[in-house]
């Protein structure tokens, strides 16, 4: 009979290396922990030196408060920290680090040197470790006020971990991404990065709106900021601010999404779900939204101690946070009008587009020129074109057919029109509506219009589809949902937790046209469904809705099914291709687009219009060269 192994304490070295497996995955993980310590120290400037993607050397130097010499050995001990003292501090954490594990874990898999000096000290002190259990030796050193941490030969004593590292470029790319995220979290701190002795990043302190906008443009690319909506709203103790990209500036990957809670970068499924809902019917299938958002909340209502790398958080009232995020973003996107999209040409950024750090855009950050609309969105009076489109009467174009008298027609083309036949011109540029006035129809599919910026091209079917869709949604919201009783109620077997959830949300289901009855601890009866969803699989829909309610505290599946049905109705009811429209009909469509929510995209997320400015047209014909 095999003897059972005895329980014994692990050695400090092995315990630290096990902890390092959670905290230290690659050089980017190390730089994250070191930068967070620098930010917590009150640093205003941080310098990072990297060699061989961070495997050979990682050095972080800051001008923070420094560490007293007596505390230096403790800084490398496990569970030793200056940031919390008791449980009450843990429940209201505002610092980025608080566990006291990072330096101990890093030092167990590398050769680490920590040098620091406080403002009241006459000299700096230094402590070193070499990835093994040893007595930390403190010695004097030369160093300005602040702290430097030098990490050499990462994973030198754990070769198995080192084998999992990627190429130097890949590891450095991950490291850059961490610095990008932290640079957006702290506009008041300057960041400088060098790789193999070459300067890569130079971000100066950004203490005003224009400087912050330049930093966002440097990190995310100028195109993002030109096509992003600045938002700021505060309600019920929650404050959300930042920039959300227009639906026309989407990505094929979720690589331009930055979200922060109290200055801490997080990747949270609740946040992702709320954002996905807000962009639901304005993004083309497979595309991802872009955003840089900051959520400020009372630290007591958010738990940051739920993940080894602190990437996830848990909110005390997750449903309130979810609804706040969704409602704010949904309204911001719904309020977008064509004039908001004219700051820059609409575009869909391809996955291969290089911007930010990879493109070296930081070097000229201070000289970066951004349009005034990016730095400060005007809040003027309602322009004169609002509501004025109905009175516009443009002349009917002559027939486009060719005749035998081509030469005569060609000469007649250059004959000036009589003054009475000319189209009425606006008194000033301010009187021109954002989408301008229609000029002609192309192949029965596109509308050509002229506005103050140049030429506008409109996909008339896509535009009319969105207008019809929004009207159907408004009508349904005002008239309510009609329920249709089932002749034979459907029985559905659930877990007791799901059945309890259905009973708790019975009134909510009723508002959406469902009537559910509890038959037993794990059984429900569906007695009524929305009349619009009579063809839907009611049992599976209820199951999916309950799963969402248990996961997120809310669900939009019923509304999504209804919207999908309305979108189909709008698609079939919209004006078809090859239908000839008169100029007044085209102008009426343009005016409707200017007053309709989300008119920049059809129900499937495709763009409904695009702008070709005079500069774009001049480039096509090589004018000005």
Curated annotation (Swiss-Prot):
In its keyword annotation, does this UniProt entry include DNA repair?
Answer: yes
Which family is annotated? Belongs to the DNA mismatch repair MutL/HexB family.
Q: Which gene encodes it?
A: mutL
State the species of origin.
Stutzerimonas stutzeri (strain A1501)
**Entry superkingdom:** Bacteria
- Please name the Pfam families in this protein's record: DNA_mis_repair, HATPase_c_3, MutL_C
State the InterPro entries in the record.
DNA_mismatch_repair_CS, DNA_mismatch_repair_MutL, DNA_mismatch_S5_2-like, HATPase_C_sf, MutL/Mlh/PMS, MutL/Mlh/Pms-like, MutL_C, MutL_C_dimsub
Its Gene Ontology cellular component terms are: mismatch repair complex
The molecule here is called: DNA mismatch repair protein MutL
A single GO molecular function term of this UniProt record: ATP hydrolysis activity
Q: Does the keyword DNA repair apply?
A: yes
């Amino acid at each position: 009979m095999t003897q059972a192994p005895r329980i014994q304490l692990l050695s400090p070295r092995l315990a630290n290396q096990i902890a390092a497996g959670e905290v230290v995955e690659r050089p980017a993980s190390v730089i994250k922990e070191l930068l967070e310590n620098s930010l917590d120290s009150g640093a205003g400037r941080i310098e990072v030196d990297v060699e061989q993607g961070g495997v050979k050397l990682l050095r972080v130097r800051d001008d923070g408060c420094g560490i007293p010499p007596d505390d230096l050995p403790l800084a490398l001990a496990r569970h030793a920290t200056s940031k919390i003292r008791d449980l009450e501090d843990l429940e209201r954490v505002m610092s980025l680090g608080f566990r006291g594990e990072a330096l101990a874990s890093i030092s167990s898999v590398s050769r680490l040197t920590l040098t620091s000096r406080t403002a009241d000290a006459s000299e700096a002190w230094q402590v070193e470790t070499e990835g093994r259990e040893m007595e930390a030796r403190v010695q004097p050193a030369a160093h300005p006020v602040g702290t430097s941490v030098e990490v050499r030969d990462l994973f030198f004593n754990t070769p198995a971990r080192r084998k999992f590292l990627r190429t130097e470029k890949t590891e450095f790319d991950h490291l850059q991404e961490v610095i990008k995220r932290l640079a957006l979290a702290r506009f008041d701190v300057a960041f400088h990065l060098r790789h193999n002795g070459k300067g890569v990043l130079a971000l100066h302190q950004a203490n005003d709106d224009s400087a912050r906008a330049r930093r966002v443009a440097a990190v995310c690319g100028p195109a993002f900021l030109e096509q992003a909506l600045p938002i700021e709203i505060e309600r019920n103790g929650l404050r959300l601010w930042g920039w959300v990209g227009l639906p026309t500036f989407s990505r094929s990957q979720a690589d331009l999404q930055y979200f922060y809670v109290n200055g801490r970068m997080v990747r949270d499924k609740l946040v992702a779900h709320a954002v996905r809902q807000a962009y639901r019917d304005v993004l083309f299938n497979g595309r991802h939204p872009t955003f840089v958002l900051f959520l400020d909340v009372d630290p007591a209502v958010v738990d940051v101690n739920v993940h080894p790398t602190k990437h996830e958080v848990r909110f005390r009232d997750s449903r309130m946070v979810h609804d706040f995020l969704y409602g704010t973003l949904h309204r911001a996107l719904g309020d977008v009008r064509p004039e908001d999209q004219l700051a820059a040409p609409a575009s869909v950024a391809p996955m291969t587009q290089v911007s930010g750090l990879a493109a070296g855009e930081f070097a000229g950050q201070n000289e970066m020129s951004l349009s005034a609309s990016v730095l400060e969105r005007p809040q003027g009076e309602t322009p004169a074109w609002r509501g004025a489109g109905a009175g516009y009467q443009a002349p009917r174009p002559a027939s486009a057919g060719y005749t035998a008298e081509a030469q005569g027609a060609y000469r007649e083309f250059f004959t000036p029109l009589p003054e009475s036949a000319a189209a009425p011109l606006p008194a000033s540029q301010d009187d021109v509506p954002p989408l301008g006035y229609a000029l002609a129809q192309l192949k029965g599919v596109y509308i050509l219009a002229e506005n103050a910026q140049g030429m506008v091209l409109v996909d008339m079917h896509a535009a009319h589809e969105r207008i019809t869709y929004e009207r159907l949604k408004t009508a349904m919201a005002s008239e309510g949902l009609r329920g249709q009783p089932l002749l034979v109620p459907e029985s559905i077997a659930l877990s007791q937790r799901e059945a309890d959830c259905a009973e708790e949300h019975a009134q909510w289901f009723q508002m959406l046209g469902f009537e559910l009855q509890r038959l037993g601890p794990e059984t429900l009866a569906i007695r009524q469904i929305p009349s619009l969803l009579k063809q839907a699989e009611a049992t599976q829909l209820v199951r999916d809705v309950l799963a969402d309610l248990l996961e997120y505290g809310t669900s939009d599946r019923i509304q999504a099914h209804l919207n999908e049905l309305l979108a189909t109705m709008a698609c079939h009811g919209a004006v078809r291709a090859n239908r000839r429209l008169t100029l007044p009909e085209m102008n009426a469509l343009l005016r409707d687009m200017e007053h309709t929510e989300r008119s920049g995209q059809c129900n499937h997320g495709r763009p409904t219009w695009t702008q070709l400015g005079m500069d774009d047209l001049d480039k096509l014909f090589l004018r000005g060269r």
